Curated annotation (Swiss-Prot):
Keyword vocabulary terms for this entry: ATP-binding, DNA damage, DNA repair, DNA-binding, Nucleotide-binding
UniProt function note: This protein is involved in the repair of mismatches in DNA. It is possible that it carries out the mismatch recognition step. This protein has a weak ATPase activity.
GO biological process: mismatch repair
UniProt cross-references to PANTHER family, sorted A to Z: DNA MISMATCH REPAIR PROTEIN MSH1, MITOCHONDRIAL, DNA MISMATCH REPAIR PROTEIN MUTS FAMILY MEMBER
Protein name stated in the entry: DNA mismatch repair protein MutS
Organism: Exiguobacterium sibiricum (strain DSM 17290 / CCUG 55495 / CIP 109462 / JCM 13490 / 255-15)
Family named by the database record: Belongs to the DNA mismatch repair MutS family.
Length: 843
């Protein structure tokens, strides 16, 4: 190995890198972060950087190297993190000016997908999750380093873990075993193995062993990667699945709660519609409310009361809206204080937010709901802290905390003296520049400064000859200029720079002292942040209710449902006002299941989603899009809507249908809501119809959940005669001039026809094809009649030849063909065998 590999610096590099084998080591050298060896090769490839060699490309053993400027490193690091990598940030931890020999370096932070603090989406959390198995349960601990929020739960199976994580959508998962890593790899979220534990207070609520262990792993990983105090980490919220309405991941997706299924964006989702929050923390809280609807009738009523009160008081609501728009992201500002990265600008923003609290309280004085009153009482304006921040900092401090200019005059007498000395020195420099110009006659003469040479007098090379000899000492020659110093300038430079350096050092010390004082208020500031966030969400729900003419739903203790003129909250907003066709729904003990028929594109799926979204809005404490609504509290919502292959796990549309249906059939209770759309379309006609009927019967007899079941098997509508709690409804369509017109009205009774060929005509299929389809349809209707048997009677059916059933009997002809030895068979034997098979097939 070449000597360069054994230099003190490279030895230091190897020693540090050995502790972080799974991360790219960004090694600080002067104004750059450098990477070496395989790190350099991979990062150069990922970020399209120039790959060089530290000891020259022509060396016998060149050391691959690439680097990025330290002031621009965040952008490069973010790119690597978003691609699932980790970065270990290795900085100089002592002043090179005061060090002889090698500067001490150490890793000051490990940045991972779950702990990235920069480039944060304003209204989204960036969760890190730990999963641990203990005493037969799986503990799930989640935390957001950027906000300090943390929460704990536990579930019984790894499948339940995967479902919970599919709702949380963490950026990184920490597991303690390779078995768990393999089991969760299908989520396609970066996974890290770590077994170190570190205890941390988790709040007052009792937790089980799995939750405690998961939180210990989470905290240890946060501490190991961030390498600093995590004083802002809030006591964990402990919750159980039974505390909230359960939503399957596919339900969140099918109902487009937080993302549009078409674009993957927030716009076009229910969250995109509701989120008119004025604050970042309010937006994040609203998303959490949508993902965890309530089961507590008391809490639902509290929220509805607050929304109703805000809706009734327009001027107070507008005052709150206007004020909330001025509120900074208090949750993340406080987290930065605890994390030790808050700047003076951050502290001024914190002060500005606290100063808004009296305005918020004044608006709330006119509102009398219990929850709004509780929120108002918890809004502590922190007057003493606000006064401290006001006295300490100028209104617009610089971004950097290391260059001065932050502290207000009058805050510290010693600093004021240094600033006066520095200011007087700069006044003296301006006077000197003017007198030197006059003495030399050089109008372009100027006084400048750089870190290497200090203060200097600069003149152009052409004017250098005009300077009198003896007094000016040449310091630096440039292409077009000469730089000089004089005895007076040297003498004053020491005084000026001494005052500047001391003032900057003192400013930073004062800043740190103030920040530490703010740190003692973290817990109370976080309480204020949570209350402002909740108020913001309630104001947003009231604003949405007014904009779109929502009504307050009535919460029922029973299981009946009555909605008049219900509307899909998102779809109605993309149509011209008044064009959305509203529909009602009525379910009770004698009418628990609706069998929905109607043409494709008529609105069956929209009707089903509309009901689910109204139910969900009710359980987050929101008004709903209807003219009247009476709703029970649903414990779960299951959906099987839309055709989608699961390409990752290799499942067909039909298998996805069956898996999602199985979830509903096995987990739903009589307090659940089930939406099943076109079950059976992924297999043959008779298989599909048989399964659809069997599923309807099973739900009615064994589950008892309120169910909307849409189908293209019109034969199933006869079940209404034998199943007393099932009712037929249909989405109306009429035929005009040979074309179908969708009315989107839901009426009792079955649909008279499917209009499939009419829909094909709307899609502009060729006229000849449409004509042929009409002829074939007529023939099929004359030659085949499908029937449905009464529940529990045996089904005798023939299987169509165009598609094999999943449940087909053994085929002897097929078995014979599979066992033929074609390689050793003579042509005559092959012909005789084919003849026998043909005869067998014709039987």
């Amino acid at each position: 190995m070449e000597a360069v590999h054994n230099t003190p610096m490279m030895k230091q590099y190897f020693s540090i890198k050995a502790d972080y084998p799974d991360a790219f080591l960004f090694y600080r050298l002067g104004d750059f972060y450098e990477l070496f060896f395989e790190d350099a090769k991979q990062v150069a490839h990922e970020l399209e950087l120039t790959l060089t060699a530290k000891n020259g490309k022509n060396a016998e053993h060149p050391i691959p190297m690439c680097g990025v400027p330290h002031h621009a490193a965040n952008g490069y690091i973010e790119q690597l993190i978003e691609r699932g990598y980790k970065v270990a940030l290795c900085d100089q931890v002592e002043d090179p000016k005061l060090t002889k020999g090698l500067v001490k370096r150490e890793v000051v932070q490990v940045i991972t997908p779950g702990t990235l603090m920069s480039s944060l989406t304003e209204k989204e959390n960036r969760y890190l999750v730990a999963v641990v198995e203990q005493d037969g349960r799986f503990g799930i601990a989640r935390g957001d380093v950027s906000t300090g929020e943390s929460a704990l739960t536990s579930v019984a199976t790894l499948d339940a873990v995967a479902k919970e994580l599919s709702i949380i959508l963490p950026r990184e998962i920490v597991v303690t075993s390779s078995e768990h890593e393999a089991a969760l790899s299908h989520l396609q979220i970066p996974l890290t193995q770590s077994t170190r534990r570190e205890t941390h207070p988790h709040g007052d609520r009792a937790i089980d062993a799995a939750q405690a262990d998961a939180f210990a792993v989470l905290y240890a990983y946060m501490h190991d990667t961030q390498k600093r105090s995590l004083a802002h980490l809030q006591p964990a919220i402990v919750y159980e699945a039974a505390d909230f309405m359960q939503l399957e991941p596919n339900t969140v997706k099918n109902l487009e709660l937080v993302r549009s299924a078409r674009t993957g964006d927030k716009k076009g989702s229910l969250l995109g519609l509701l989120d008119v929050t004025g604050t970042a923390m309010g937006g994040r809280m609203l998303k959490r409310w949508l993902e965890k609807p309530l089961l507590s009738q008391h809490t639902i009523a509290e929220r509805l009361d607050a929304v109703e009160e805000l809706l009734a008081h327009y001027f107070e609501r507008q005052q709150l809206k206007d004020t909330l728009r001025e509120v900074y992201d208090l949750e993340r500002l406080v987290a930065k204080v605890g994390y030790g990265t808050a700047s003076a600008r951050d502290l001024v923003q914190l002060k500005s937010t606290l100063r808004l609290i009296p305005r918020i309280q004044a608006a709330l004085e006119e509102l009398f709901s219990d929850r709004l009153g509780q929120l108002a009482l918890g809004l502590d304006p922190h007057d003493e802290l606000t006064d401290l921040l006001d006295r300490a900092f100028v209104e617009a401090p610089p971004i950097s905390t290391k260059d001065g200019g932050m502290i207000r005059t009058g805050f510290d007498p010693a600093l004021d003296e240094l600033l006066v000395a520095s200011k007087d020195g700069k006044t003296w420099l301006a006077t000197l520049e003017a007198s030197e110009r006059q003495a030399t006659g050089i109008k372009t003469l100027k006084i400048g400064y750089n870190r290497v040479f200090g203060y200097y007098i600069e003149v152009s090379r052409a004017n250098a000859k005009l300077l009198p000899e003896g007094r000016y000492e040449r310091k630096q020659t440039l292409a077009n200029a000469e730089r000089y110093v004089t005895p007076e300038l040297k003498e004053k430079e020491a005084l000026i720079l001494g005052a500047e350096e001391k003032s900057i050092t003192l400013e930073y010390e004062l800043f740190c002292q103030v920040r530490d004082q703010v740190k003692t208020h973290i817990e109370s500031l976080q309480r204020v942040s949570r209350r402002i966030a909740e108020l913001d969400v309630l104001v947003a729900l009231a604003e949405t209710a007014e904009r779109h003419d929502y009504v307050r739903p009535v919460t029922l203790t029973g299981r009946n449902v009555m909605i008049e003129n219900g509307r899909h909250p998102v779809i109605e907003t993309v149509l011209p006002r008044g064009e959305y066709v509203a529909n009602g729904i009525n379910l009770n003990e004698d009418r628990e299941m609706l069998l929905i028929t109607g043409p494709n594109m008529s609105g069956k799926s929209t009707y089903m989603r509309q009901f689910a979204l109204i139910a969900l809005l009710h359980q987050i404490g929101s008004f709903v899009p209807a003219s009247r609504a009476e709703l029970p509290i649903f414990d779960q919502i299951f959906t099987r809507i839309g055709a989608a292959d699961d390409l990752v796990s290799g499942q067909s549309t039909f298998m996805v249908e069956m898996v999602e249906t199985q979830e509903a059939l096995t987990r739903a209770t009589d307090r659940s809501l089930i939406l099943l759309d076109e079950i059976g379309r992924g297999t043959s006609t008779y298989d599909g119809m048989a399964l659809a009927q069997a599923i309807v019967e099973h739900i009615a007899e064994h589950v008892g959940a309120k169910t909307l079941f849409s189908t293209h098997y019109h034969e199933l509508t006869v079940l209404e005669d034998s199943m007393p709690r099932l009712a037929n409804v249909h989405v109306r369509a009429v035929e005009q001039d040979g074309r179908v017109v969708f009315l989107h009205e839901v009426r009792d009774g079955k649909a008279d026809q499917s209009y499939g060929i009419h829909v094909a005509r709307l899609a502009d299929l060729p006229d000849a094809l449409i004509a042929r389809a009409e002829v074939l349809l007529s023939e099929f209707e004359q030659t085949e009649e499908r029937t449905v048997v009464s529940p529990k009677e045996p089904v005798v059916q023939a299987e169509p030849v165009d598609q094999l059933s999943l449940f087909a009997e053994t085929d002897p002809v097929r078995e014979t063909v599979q066992t033929l030895d074609l390689i050793n068979m003579t042509p005559l034997e092959a012909l005789n065998t084919l003849y026998r098979l043909q005869a067998e097939a014709r039987k």
